[in-house]
Structure formats: structure tokens, C-alpha cells
């Protein structure tokens, strides 16, 4: 069975000793008893099973001590309430059971106290803050000494324990309920412990402030001794009253586990001394082996009880012969035994067998006599096993008075409300009453009163609870003294129990202690100090093994073994402690004995016990003394009833005192708070500077501070006012907006109403007009049918709308008064008008007229039919049969008309076919004629074009030497170049292309189609195609190839991911916003341009020169402004300046550009033209050491490691004549003309050209033509000077893409192909020669060599078979090298028998052989043109070549 047991505080008595620090096993040693559980668990885990007997005996010792005291008190209670009851023993046993359970709770309360049980080092730190030690080593709370102790008895309902009372019901539903309750309690405990830890982590943690007021510390200590040896070591602990209302949260373990801990106190040999820190120890849970042992013990108990019953029946026969006095004594003694048996039954978890030492004080020692168990004992045992009643919650009302055990003397004062054995170590005296306790600490008194106990029914928490008033009984001083005498006489100093059960309470209601002393008769000896020896104790134990242990043992161990262990353990004990224990037990048991005898006279159910062999009866002096004692006990019972009434009054007084104490405590708290506030104010005053001022005037600082505070307040108020004003303005604005909206809504509503009214009026007017029109019109069947048709049409239109309730369509029915309804109405109106006129003439009243008119109108006017007859089928119409008859008559006439019309149509169609055929024939004839004429024209044009092409080819062959094909293909075909350059060829090519297209389109004979005229042809074609496919290897391969399945399913293919990262809703607005934020000044723009030219497109480097710009800003600015600032052109110019310093010395671009149409090679108009007999002379000048540069982006040479001369382009014009005398002219005149032309070009075309005035540093080469050929009608030569390949302005950008130098030269020179000068002259002047020599150059070697055609390449390939170099070829090569430098293609053109690759290999091979490096350096000093020479005889060969040219 599972019984919920409340935790109870254990009051503690004082025993002063001197051996506080000794680690001995004496009863005089004082230490903390509540830590026995923790210390035993820490030190005795290894010796747990070896010392079971000693530990179990030690545990039961404490429990039995407590039980004895409770039994004595509860006997008195039962006697007072059940005097005439025959079943006293049954109630007595029930109460004893409850009391014993309460005693167990008392033991557990000390173990579950907050300061001693709660695990963890946090508890120790918390106690170290507020605890101190006495001179004896006792720990107590120095802060809470003066706090009310009533909280010890508060909220006991929340602290419950569970004990496995009967383990035979392990499979019952109650066991399951127990497990559920344990789980709930564990969860609650974990939550509370978590909250408690969080509470302790706070920085403002303080007991005195954060916690509720706690009562003063009851420095009462519990005793745990070894019952077998009597030499146990004493452990004293303080019962800390702090946080009593939540004890479950202060312990780490569940209640069931805590109960096991309390019941499993280990051997005292392994106990530790008092620790001021009170470190709690952890106890492991009980193992299942112990549970099995308990079950075995219970079975043995039942067997023993059966044996005891048999023995009792035998004893009853013997006891009937004895006297009534012996029977009463025996009855009293038997009741004590029953109490002790109940104690043992309730302490099943203790597993001990040593209750005999406490309870068998007056038992007989003979082996023949056996103690018996009464039926009442059996009933109590059965009730305990089968009861489902929880133990009542009895709260200790007070602690006990002090007992002194010094100099081997014992003084005992009995009490009624004590519950446990207690010891107190300390200096503070305690004054205790029946129902209240007063602890005097530091000259202050605080009184604690108990709370009402409750009796709870059921097994769970949620069941009903019934309050039960406590039954308090008190025994008089006389009964106490008589009990002392009787127990001392019964024991005779031979008591077997070495245990102690001290319980002292003063009966007086006052706060002072009243020691009770009763007059005893001279015949009754009072034993106060009886010396006992260890040998006597051992003998008694050995003699009583068989009798005592058979009644009371509940353990698995044998009785003899247990008692032998007790004897062995008693060897270490002291005689003084044994004497003390035995005396005290005798007195308590006597008290119980006497109380039960007085009120069990009428009980006939209890069999007597034979006490013939009892050693305690030897000291009784006659039956008279005993009868006197019984009388005294009856008197005491009467006095006790009176005392109960007094106690009730005292309780009321105590309650009032408690209320007063609470009020006082609250006042003290308020005083403390006030005192703290005063201290804080004093500290602030000390910290602030103090000045000596007059009391009436404030200090300057105070005034200034006050002024500042006022100003701050004013500023705050002003800010508040402004904020309020702003809010008010906003509210007003909102109100105005809402008003405007309301006005607009009202206007809108009014307008809608007005419109509705107007529409209603219009509808009415339209209806009236329709009625008038309908009345005026004469209706016919056609008009009625048309109106119905229109109405139905309008209704059918409305059917397309979503929400429309279609009306039924009207049907035409001439019989249903659809016709001439209006005429009838008009006739009725006319008649009414006539009647009115007649009535007026007769002078009748208007009212009567109106009434009559209305009646007539209602009677005469027939209303229009709202809904006509609806016909569902065609046959329902009346006109259906009429129409059939009429159509039968018309049918013959209609057939005749249709035949006539058909014949006429056939005739008309025949005429149209004839006309169409005749027109087609005429059209074909005309078309043939047109084609013949057109073909003739085309043939004539083709012949002309062919002639022109032949002429051009001949001219090209004459002008250009044969060339070998180069590796690079032409950029544009000959057709494109001819279209761009030739004067008349473009038109001819275009006409040829159009004529060919017309031939394809117009000639019918040349057109072929794939159309099959029949199925047979189609099948033949398909068969041929299949044969071809069968022979085709690709088709065979494709047939054998497997079709690759799609990698993705169609569903996955349709899946598209739309990425919205960086999505811009309105890019235009964002760009405007960005531009508005970023503003570039002109200085910044100029700075950017400079840095960009230094570090092109290195935006991070450029951004480092700006303070408030990033690389992103640089990039954005560049791409937005690169065209407006012309950054590419500027960058190219800057790079060309660097490259120009190391450029090629010789520039071979000396050519004449002419064109009839005045366009350059890109089709752009030229800006410079000349008259007849004038040409442009383009010369390239090189200057050494000059600073002038060209602005051409195309012809600028590439940069190199070294700086070289800079190239210049000079355009000179001169009038040319056909006379040979004018062919030669001086170089000075050319220089002058160059200067003039440069100035003109700078003004017109914005070209940056420089004038070269130094003859020493400049050399010019000019090509002149004596006669210019004439192509076309005009004789003018148009010269293009705006070509980007020749001269480029600073602002102009080339329109063509970037090309290589060779491609540019080819594109530029194709414009002058049609020119074929007969005798061009080459004049060269050097700075070293003083006289100018004029020598005729070869026949246009330069211009002819610039054009490359496909035909020349084919000829060169044939002539390139000869790889040997003749002397003539070498001479030509030397001349070409002097002119063209390292441009091997031009050299090959000049030599005409070698390719560019052959010239390149010949040049480097000869250079390697002759090591011409030195010769090139010497030649550079003599001439400004840097070109290599092959041998020293180059000048002679050059003169010979000139002579050959002249001869040609």
C-alpha cells in the first residue's frame, strides 16, 4: 500500500557535551543528525551490504525512540475519549499506527530540511553567507534568529512523502498510480529546482530582502545512535526554517527516494563529524534486492504473528488464575507491546529488528513463558495492511524542554504533545509550553503555534480532504511521577533497551519553564540514577532473545543473530549512556502502562499475560500501592479534561499573539526600510559637497541647479507644446481633407440623384412620345411584325450579359388585337372629349365630370396586351397552313424563272471565256516582243562590258608587274573594288545583274519544276530516291543508329526559372535618380581624362586620385561619356606620341589619289579638288629629332623600346604640263608649295601638320606625272584629301574598322588603278649633296606594284621556280631596299621575279653573312633614310639601273 506522509519538523532538545570535535561513537558526542543520510551514502557505498545489521538497528533505534513517546501521548488521548468503549485496543492501535507514521515523518523532516538536504554547492554558498558557528561548533543562521517561527508549521500539505507500505500489491492499480504521482512530483521538482537556480544567479540575490520572513532557528538536533552497541556517534543539525513552504523544490530527489534515504541510514562507524558548510550528500536508490528482502520479511512476520497467536492462547489459560492487579498490569504491558508491534509494522522500509530494546522493558525473561498477540493487535495489523487511509497530518505544536545528563544523573519531565526524540546543542535556552514554543534568542521572544491537521482520504492528490481537529491530552504531574515509579520498579535497573527517547514539555501556559514534581509515597521508590554495566545488558539480551524477538522482529535476520550483534556492539558503549537510556525508557513505558490501565477496566477482550517470571515486578510493594496509583490516575484524567479546556483557551490566545507578532514583524520591516532610506540619504549627503550657509537662503549652486532644472522643464514643456501643436495641425489637416472628401461625396451623390431624376424624366417623355407616335400611326401587320422583331432583337442582345433575366419573346398574332389598337384608343379619347364639352355646356360640376370620365375610360379603353400568345412549334402558327397553300401556287412560276436565269448565266460565262482567251493571247505576244528587245539590249551591254573589262585587264597587265599570291586573302573582291573605284564599271555590273535576274524570271523555257503530273511519275521519283538512299552510306548509317531519348521529360523542359535578382521595376526612373545624385564638375572631368590617358581602363587606380568617388562611379562615367569626350581618339593620340619616338624610318606611302566622282574609297565626298592639268603630290617626309607628330589613327607606327624619327605627310600641288621641260623642277619649289598647302589644310580640315624648314634634317621624295589620262567626259582630276588613312583631324573618327597597314595600303591604292602615267620621274635630294640631280625613274614601278590581282599571283607562282639570284636581281633588290626598307612585298614587286618570302630570306641570309650592322650604322650617318645595303657597289648599281630605265 502507498501512503502519503507529510514531512514534519522535528523539535530538538539540548544535550551539552564537551567532546564536540572527537570522532567517537559515544552518545555524548554532539553532531548534525540530519546529515547522517548524506554522510552514510557518501562513505558507506562500499560497505553497504556488510553493515546492514548495524545500520538497520541504528535506524530502528531512532524510530522506536520516537514511537515510544508518541505512544505514551496517544494512549492518554484515547483513554480520555474512549473510556467506556469495549474496543479500546482497536482505536488505540489505529491511533498508534498514525502516530508511528507521524514519527517516521519526523525523521524525514530533518532529512528534508532546506539547509541540510538540498544538494549542490550552491546551497553551501548560500548558507555560508548567513551562517556562523557557536563555540560548540553548531551552525545557525545569524540573520534569521529573530524571525517568527510560525512558518515552521506553514504549508505542510505541500510536503508529502510516499512509502511502499505493502509490496505485495505491486501489480495493483495503486502501484501504477504511485508511479504516475512520482513522475509528476519529479517533473515538479525539476521545474522548481531550475527556477531556484535561476533565482540564485541573479545579482540582486539576498535572503533578507527577496524571501519571506522566516521564524527563528530552533537549534534542536536529532539523535541517531547505534541501538546494538549504544556507542553511536551523535550528529546534530540545525533545522533551517527558510523557504519552508516549498521544501520539494529544495531537495534534489523525489519524495519516495527521500523516504528511502531516511530509512537507509548507514553505519555510524562511517559517519563524518559536523561540517559547518552542511554539505548534503546524495543517496542512491534502493536496489531491487532490498525489496525482495522486504517481501521475505513480511512473510516471516505473518508466520511469527501466527505463532504468537497460538502462544497467546496458551498464555490466556495460565493467566486466568492470576489476580486482577496482575491482569491490569499485564494488560497495560500488553498495550505497550501492541504499540511497539505497530511501530515495527509501520517501519517496514527500515529492515531492522531492534525495537525490542525499546519496547520489551517489562517483559518476562523466562523461556517457558511466551508473550502473546491479542486479537486487537491482529485487527490493527490487518487494518494497516488493507487500509487505504492516508495518515493524518499532525504538525508538531511545540518542541520539548531540555534534559540534562551531566554527572550521571537523570531528570525527566513528561509531556503530552511530544512526538519525537530531540536533542539540542547550543547556548540559547528554549522555553516551551503545551501548544506553543518560545525561543529566547538575544533577549527576544517569538511564539510558534501549530496549524490544524488534516485527514486526507484516497490515494491521489486530487481527492477530498477533511479537516480533523487535533486531540490534545495532557497528563498531570502526579501521573508522570507515578509512571516514573512504576517503570523503574518494573525494570529494576535491568532494562534491555539501551536507547533514549527524551520528551519534555512544560504544562504551564506561561513562557517560563515549569518543572513538574509530584509527591510520591514512601513505598514507591524513584529510580533516577541506576548504574548499569555492559555485562548486565548483554545478559539481558541473551535471556530475552526467544521471547521478545518472536513478538517484534520484522527482519530477515534471525533473532539470535540480531541480539548477538547487539551484544557485540554494546562493548564499545559507555555505562553512563546505557544507564541514561534504560532509565528513560522505563519511565516512558511506565507512563504508557499506567495510562492504559486506568481506562481499560471494562475491556474483556484482552487476555492477560503471565508476569510470573518478569523481573520488573519484584520491586512492587503490595497491591495497595498499586490501587492508590490507579486512583491517582483517574484523578489525573479529570484534570486532563480541565487542562484541555485551558489549552483551547491558550490556543486562542496564541493565535491573537501570532497576529500581533505578524503586525510587529511588518512594523519592523517598515522600520528597517526607513532606516535603509535614511542611510542612503546620509550617504548621498556625505558624497555631495556641503556648504555652510544661512538657514534662510539657499546656496548658489542650489539656485543654479534649480534654474537649470526649471529651464530643462521649460524646454521639455516647449518641446511637448510644439509636438502637440504639430499633432493638432496634422489633425486639422486631416479634418479638412475629410471634410473635402465628404463634400465631394455629397456632391457626387447629389449629381447621381439629379441624373437619376433626369433619366426618369427622359424615360417618361420617351414613353409618352412613343405612345403618341403609336397612337398617331396607323398600324399594319408589317409594322407590328417589325416592332416585335426589334423588341426580340434587343432582348437577345441582353442575353450576352452575365446577369440577365430573359423575358419571353413575343409572337405575332393578328387575332390577338395587335392591330389597330391605337386607332381604338384615339376614337375613345375623341368621344370622351365630346362628352366633356357637352357637360360643360350643361354646367355640371368638374368633380362629377372627372369621376364619370375616369369610369368611362376604365370601361371603354382596352389595354394593350402585355404578353401575346407564345408558339412553341411552327405548326401552332395560323399562317403556317396559309403559307403552304400560297407556296403551292407560286412554285410553278418560280421553276420557270429559275430555268431562264440558268440559261442566261451559261451564255454569259461562254462570252467571258472567249474574251479572256483572246486577251491572254495578245498579252503573250506583247510579252515575247518585249523579251526579245530586252535580250538584245542586254547582249549589247554585255559586249560593251566585256570590252571594257578586257581593256582594263590589259592596262593592269601593263601597269603592274606580276605578283605572287600572299598568305593573306583579299578583304574585298574585285567586283567590289571595281564598283567602288571605276567610273563606268559600276553601272555596267548593276545592269548585268538585273538583266540576268530578268532572264531567270521571264524566260519560261529555262524554268524547271519538281511537280509530278501523275501518281505514276511520283512513284517513279520516290523509287529513284529510295535507291539513292540505299546506296548512300550516310543513310545506311542513320538507319542503324538508335534514336537518343531526350535527356529531360517534356514537363521538365517546360519548367523555366525566372530570376528576379536585381529586378528593377522602372530603370528609367532609377537612372534619373542615380544621375541626379552623381554630379561631375569640369575639373573632375579633366582630371579623369588625364588619369585615364595615363592608366587606361584601370578604374580602381583612377579612383584612388579622387576623394569622393569609387570605382563604380569611374566605370559609369566612362561608359556614359566615352563618345562625347572622344576618349578612344585621345588615348590613341597619346599612345601614338609614345610610339612615334621609335617608328620606322622609311615610309613608302608615296602615291597619287585621283577619282572622277570626287569620292574617297569609302564613298565619302572629298573636300579638295583641282582643275585640269593638276595633280596632288603626296610625299612622306621624315624628320630626325623633330617634335612634330601625325594625328592619323591608322598610319601611326607602333611603339617600340627606342625612340625613332617621326613621319609627316605633306601634300603639294603643282600645275602639270605635257611638255617634257616642265617635268623637272627643283626641290626648293616643292618645299615652298608644301608649306603653303600645309597651312591651307590646317585651316580647312583641322589637320595637325608641321612645316619642316630645316634642309639638313629633312628629306623629301616626290613623284610627279607629266601627263594625266582622261577617263570620262571631263578632263578634271578630283583629289581626295579627307581620307582617314592620309590625314586625320583631332575631332574626326575613322568610319572603317581597324585594318593592318598592308590592308590599308591596298584599300587606298585601288583608287588610282585606272591612272597609267607614261613617264613618271623620281627626284630625290639628300642633305649631303649640294647639287640636285634629276634622274628618270623606271616606268611607274611604285603605282603598278600597289595593285594586287588574282591573275598576277598565278603568273608569279609559275615564275617562282627559279630560286637563284642573278646579278641583275641583286641590283634591283639593293635599289628597292634603299627605297622601301624592310617592306619585302614592295621589294618583291620591284624585283618582279621573286616573292616577298624569298626577298625576306635573301635579306637576312646576306645580312648574316656580311654582318651588315656596321654598314647600316655608317649609311645612317650619310643619309636620313635608314635602309640596309647589300654591298659597297650599291651606288654604281643604282646609277646603272637609272640608265636602263632611261633607255626603256
UniProtKB/Swiss-Prot annotation:
SUPFAM superfamilies: Homeodomain-like. Keywords: Nucleus, Repeat. Residues 189-207, 271-280, 361-372, 513-532, 606-620, 971-983 have a biased composition (Polar residues). Residues 1075-1126, 1360-1411 form the SANT domain. PROSITE patterns: SANT. It is found in: Nucleus. GO terms for cellular component: chromatin; nucleoplasm; protein-containing complex. One of its GO terms (biological process) is regulation of transcription by RNA polymerase II. InterPro entries: Homeodomain-like_sf, Myb_dom, N-CoR_corepressor, SANT/Myb, SANT_dom. The keyword Repeat applies. Pfam families: Myb_DNA-binding. Residues 42-57, 120-132, 828-847, 1439-1448 have a biased composition (Basic and acidic residues). This is Myb-like protein P. It comes from Dictyostelium discoideum (Social amoeba).
